[in-house]
Amino acid sequence: MARQTTVSAACDLGGPPLLWDKLDRMRDCASRWHHNAVTYAYPAGNDRPERRPLDVVAHRGASDDAPEHTLAAYRKAIEDGADALECDVRLTADGHLVCVHDRRVNRTSNGRGAVSTLELADLAALDFGSWKAPTGEHEAPDRDPERDNREHTSVLTLERLLELVADSGRRVELAIETKHPTRWAGQVEERLLALLGRFGLADPPRDDPSPVRVMSFSARSLHRVRAAAPALPTVYLMQFLSLRYRDGRLPAGVDIAGPSIRIVRNHPEYVARLHRAGNRVHVWTVNEPEDVELCARLGVDAVITNRPKAVLTQLGRR
């Protein structure tokens, strides 16, 4: 436990806190999450304000402007006004949840190897951002270049992302995707729910919309989540439209569909089918203006995009 706390702190921008300071900070973050969720909650009954026809979710952060899954990308998405942040989580060899999409780190870092075979300290030594040059709008006289560089290049733990959202001062939702298959099987969901529990997010009140939802292409993963945390919303992601769910039904206990934009383009009537079955619809990855327009016209509930600022501007919300 002592090693886990020390390693986790090594990836923290604020330096290594003592164990009791870390626990106090987590309790404080849980309080701020609750404050933001309640103060800026949607109206009762999951009804969304009429002024917002669909939610804009930042895919791996504002990943068109900053390296994906870095603190810089998520900070930019919050500054741009994204309603929610999307992240992928994987389990390291020493049991930490990190925000990395690929099974291996080769594409997004200067290292090699599978995330599941590397410890957090190994990942903390890698550069996860220099492959993507930051845009000019991040350069401001009052910014700390050293901090900015760390935020653009350091591996991001889910714990640190939860802290960032807690500090946002407004309601920012989080869509967390579990990556499968994995050598850790159900341990990913177990560790995820334990971490959410420490932030007071694993058991949201049934009469309030949860600020966190869990997504996966794996129905088995979602079943594990629903069994352990039945009040937590789950999203069934779909790359292709299978015959099994063509009528609008979803796996048991799931009430949010996550079809790809390709499915929506090829089968626009599917959105209405999902809605008739009582499901919400979150579409990924929606970057092009014509796709944003299509989703708005069809009445989807959320679009997941690499370009939250551009989408919000197109929707007249900036």
List the model feature ranges, each with a label.
Residues 2-7, 11-13, 18-318:
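Phosphate-group recognition and catalysis centered on beta-loop-alpha active-site segments
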